[in-house]
């Protein structure tokens, strides 16, 4: 009976949060809109993400800025669920965060492998990762090569699977992605 109450509360919390998500029909309607400002106007008019979009100014109507806001909302939702859970349920959520961590590492690998000149733009994720993750964004943004990136992951569980590829010839981004996915699953 205890598990029913414990998990029933979590399921109820998630269902309540789920009711505020976009439906497949909403996505179809959004796909028919022309331009980011039209999508934002539709989301505002239909009551989605008001706490995120209400403060958005016209100069921040760039897709990248909006993606950052929505990603932060995803992290905020994770935090709400995490705080609601007991210690046993938090163990699962700690495993679930690996998805966010591997996405972050993949992003950083793309930056260093493709030698992008633009600096890492990860400061908007910093608070979340500092609190819930073993990965230091401060260390990752200093990486300019794959070797540096892997070294900056030394104190994490991702160091071993990635460092195993380091001395092999012809390693590509796909190989690193595959190693992370295999480790995660």
Language-model segments: what does each one mean?
Residues 1-185:
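N-terminal domain-start signal
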């Amino acid at each position: 009976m205890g598990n029913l109450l414990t998990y029933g509360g979590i399921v109820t919390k998630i269902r309540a949060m789920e009711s505020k998500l976009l439906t497949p029909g909403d996505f179809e309607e959004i796909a028919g809109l022309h331009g980011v400002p039209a999508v934002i106007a539709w989301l505002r008019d239909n009551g989605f993400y008001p706490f995120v979009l209400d403060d958005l100014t016209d100069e921040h109507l760039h897709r990248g800025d909006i993606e950052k806001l929505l990603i932060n909302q995803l992290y905020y939702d994770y935090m709400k669920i995490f705080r609601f859970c007991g210690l046993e349920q938090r163990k699962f959520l700690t495993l679930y965060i690996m998805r966010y961590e591997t996405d972050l590492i993949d992003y950083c690998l793309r930056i260093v492998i493709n030698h992008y000149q633009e600096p890492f733009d990860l400061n908007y994720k910093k608070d979340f990762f500092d609190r819930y993750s073993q990965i230091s964004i401060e260390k990752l943004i200093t990486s300019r090569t794959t070797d540096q990136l892997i070294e900056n992951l030394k104190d994490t569980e991702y160091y071993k699977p990635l460092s195993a590829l380091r001395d092999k010839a012809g390693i590509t981004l796909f190989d690193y992605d595959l190693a992370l996915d295999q480790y995660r699953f």
